[in-house]
Amino acid sequence: MACGLALKRPLQHEYESFLTDETYNGEAKRARTQCPPFRAQMGTIAATLPSTSTFAQKFKEQEESVFQAATLMTRLSRNQLKTYLSSEVKNLRKRKAIPRSNDFDDDGDQRGDGCSSNYSKAYRAPSSPKSGSDSEGEAPSTSVTDRSSAKREFTMANVQMICERLLKQQEIRLRNEFEMVLTKKLDEQHQQYVQFAAEQLNSKCVSTGDDYSYSYLS
């Protein structure tokens, strides 16, 4: 009710008479009668402010090593490493550097029926007339035993895990070497700068005749 009555008042006449009064400064009155600037809601302000996780992430990015950018660009993913190892295995098999095995397919994954397929290929039942004796049927069983004993010790997953660990160790070693070399170079440059500053100060002392023996470089 009060708000509605206040809006219905004829404020234009009162406002003009108030401004035409000579006892007061009109500019000051106009400045006082102006509405305050619009203030945004507190929820909008809070939404626009960055969260604590954003600050923590920025602070973490500043503290990261110089290797971070190079690591993201050059580090091999698991799929890339698996593809590389599979291609290397294929090349070695083509050059007959490693024997072919049916336990693993071309992608390097282990087959579930590898043992049964090897056994079915190696064992030949004495059904033909040429293999009437039992000794001929027992002979291929020894080859199955030899193949099972000569089974590879590492699968593709084991080789991939070993390569990942070796790459990680190599990365740590390179980082340590780089930090040592960088620290040594910075120390040498600092010593050269201190020596240069001392020589300049001594030459200035000799030319001007002033005594700077108690300077901050002493």
UniProtKB/Swiss-Prot annotation:
Q: Which GO terms describe its cellular component?
A: chromatin; nucleus
Its annotated compartments are: Nucleus
User: Which tissue types show expression of this protein?
Assistant: Localizes to somatic tissues throughout the body, including muscle cells. Expressed in lateral epithelial seam cells, the hyp7 epidermal syncytium, and multiple head and tail neurons.
Effect of gene knockout: 16% embryonic lethality, reduced egg laying and a 0.9% increase in the number of male progeny. Delayed progression of meiosis, which most likely results from defective disassembly of synaptonemal complex proteins, and defective chromosome structure, alignment and condensation. RNAi-mediated knockdown results in reduced expression of the nlp-29 antimicrobial peptide following fungal infection by D.coniospora. Worms show reduced body size and muscle function.
- Which keywords label this protein? DNA-binding, Immunity, Innate immunity, Meiosis, Nucleus, Transcription, Transcription regulation
Q: Name one GO biological process term.
A: meiotic cell cycle
Under the heading InterPro entries, the entry gives: Akirin
Compositionally biased intervals (Polar residues): 128-147
Q: Which PANTHER family match?
A: AKIRIN-RELATED
Functionally, this protein is described as follows: Molecular adapter that acts as a bridge between a variety of multiprotein complexes, and which is involved in antifungal innate immunity, development of the muscle and sister chromatid cohesion. Plays a role in antifungal innate immunity by acting as a bridge between components of the NuRD (Nucleosome Remodeling and Deacetylase) and MEC chromatin remodeling complexes. NuRD and MEC complexes bind to the promoters of antimicrobial peptide genes and may recruit other proteins such as ceh-18 to control gene expression in response to fungal infection.
Quaternary structure note: Interacts with hda-1, a component of the NuRD complex. Interacts with let-418, a component of the NuRD and MEC complexes. Interacts with the transcription factor ceh-18. Interacts with ima-2.
Q: Which family does it belong to?
A: Belongs to the akirin family.
The name on file for this protein is Akirin
Q: What is the lineage of its organism?
A: Eukaryota, Metazoa, Ecdysozoa, Nematoda, Chromadorea
